[in-house]
From Swiss-Prot:
GO BP term, pick one: thiamine diphosphate biosynthetic process
Name of the encoding gene: thiC
Pfam families: ThiC_Rad_SAM
Binding site for [4Fe-4S] cluster: C422, C425, C430
Cofactor(s) for this UniProt protein: [4Fe-4S] cluster
Designated name of the protein: Phosphomethylpyrimidine synthase
Length: 444
């Protein structure tokens, strides 16, 4: 849908959404986002220019539908997919893309680490109408035959540009983890739980040199500026357990991410900040406020956070609790967690479960923040329930298939779609029906 929009800007020296916004130009992408969000296009432009909102939209992903991540927009969710060395199948990842889009993921990250990574990514982008994000260090390591000591800045930049050419709309870059933070890591209960962060630690300790993503950050920005790839500044030192939440390692890295944010903005590159992780409920609001302060109000993109460490098999629920709170306090995007978190590679059904849990969290946050129209669908659902309009209830549910499936387990016949009861209460104990009968008999 963006082919004509991108083509007419082909001769512009800079083609990032932030650049145009700062020039006072409302792009077609901004117009599209404004309609979807129900906001004024000029507000979208101002938020993008200020850095409080990003529109991740690589100039080479032409069939992508524009979307916005920022405090003024609806709370978004990201779904992770990707192969591993033990399970690498492009068709399987495409199936996950379809599930992600069916159930409402706003962005998708391809975290593949096994198989033909370029081919998998190409298929993922081809089938995606939402922005695709990646973590380039995974392919960099893959292309170095899994020998982190063979990583060079030239190899790093080559992979980053290759992925940008393919149409990746945002990169997680682990540039804020500096060599001097290693003593802080040693004090932790669980050390480093970020894959990218642990790889950077291994490289830095092998060479006793500074993080190459940090030293080559200007070169990375040049690539992002060329293709309008947004940066998702990775939290290599996010807490992986409640005991490590809000510690010095996490917060010192966050300060560096704030410095890198300003560098990116100097080159008109859009930025969001990645956040924890595992955080007790009583620390979530503080984490949001600290990010806003340290990182100049750049959009905050959080993984959960999980509010307990003992929910294995149900981490999508433990994290959705924290995600709803984070969204309420000001996080702009929530990275989903599936039931397989900490246990294994998620399949398509796990992806569905994670997305729906996070759609609930994001929607709850939008209602709590008073976003315009957020509660309209809830009010419509209430009307449908009170009227016993079963088909309308299924239609309005975040997961219509699951709602219908559960109803039909006990009352599958079509006649029960007109019934004024469900199998929970039956025809004699339905509170709605009893209330309606009272009002009909005695008046309101």
């Amino acid at each position: 849908m963006r082919k004509e929009w991108v083509e007419k800007r082909k001769k512009d020296s800079v083609r990032t959404q932030m650049y145009y916004a700062r020039q006072g130009i409302v792009t077609e992408e901004m117009e599209y986002v404004a309609k979807v969000e129900g906001l004024d296009p000029e507000l979208i432009r101002k938020e993008v220019a200020r850095g409080r909102m990003i529109i991740p939209a690589n100039i080479n992903h032409l069939h992508q539908k524009p979307m916005a991540i920022g405090i003024a927009a609806k709370c978004k969710i990201n779904a992770n997919i990707g192969s591993s060395a033990l399970a690498s199948d492009a068709a399987g990842e495409v199936e996950k893309v379809k599930v992600c889009q069916k159930y409402g993921a706003d962005t998708i990250m391809d975290l593949s680490t096994g198989g033909d990574l370029d081919a998998i990514r190409e298929e993922v982008i081809k089938h995606a109408e939402v922005p695709i994000g990646t973590v380039p260090i995974y392919q960099i390591l893959h292309d170095c035959n899994n020998k982190i000591e063979d990583l060079t800045i030239d190899k790093m930049l080559e992979v980053i540009e290759r992925q940008a050419q393919q149409g990746v709309s945002y990169f997680t870059i682990h540039a804020g983890f500096l060599l001097r933070f290693m003593p802080l890591v040693a004090k932790r209960k669980m050390g480093i739980v970020s894959r990218g962060g642990s790889l950077m630690a291994a490289w830095m300790m092998h060479y006793h040199k500074e993080n190459p993503f940090y030293t080559a950050f200007d070169d990375i920005l040049d690539i992002c500026r060329k293709y309008d790839v947004s940066l998702s500044l990775g939290d290599s030192l996010r807490p992986g357990c409640l005991a490590d939440a809000s510690d010095d390692a996490q917060l010192e890295e966050l300060k560096v991410l704030g410095e890198l944010t300003l560098k990116a903005w100097d080159k008109d590159v859009q930025v969001m900040i990645e956040g924890p992780g595992h955080v007790p409920m009583n620390q979530i609001e503080r984490n949001i406020k600290i990010e806003r302060d340290y990182c100049h109000e750049a959009p905050f993109y959080v993984l959960g956070p999980l509010v307990t460490d003992i929910a294995a098999g149900y981490d999508h629920l433990a994290s959705a609790i924290g995600a709803a709170m984070a969204g309420w306090y000001g996080a702009s995007m929530l990275c989903y967690v599936t039931p397989k978190e900490h246990l294994g590679l998620p399949n398509a059904e796990d992806v569905r479960e994670g997305i729906v849990a996070y759609k609930i969290a994001a929607h709850a946050a939008d209602i709590a923040r008073g976003r315009k129209g957020a509660r309209d669908v809830d009010d419509a659902m209430s009307d449908a329930r009170y009227k016993f309009d079963w088909n309308k209830q299924f239609e309005l549910a975040l997961d219509p298939d699951r709602a219908r499936e559960y109803h039909d387990e006990t009352l599958p016949q079509d006649v029960f779609k007109e019934a004024e009861f469900c199998s929970m209460c039956g025809p004699k104990f339905c509170s709605y029906k009893i209330t309606q009968d009272i009002l009909e008999k005695h008046g309101a």
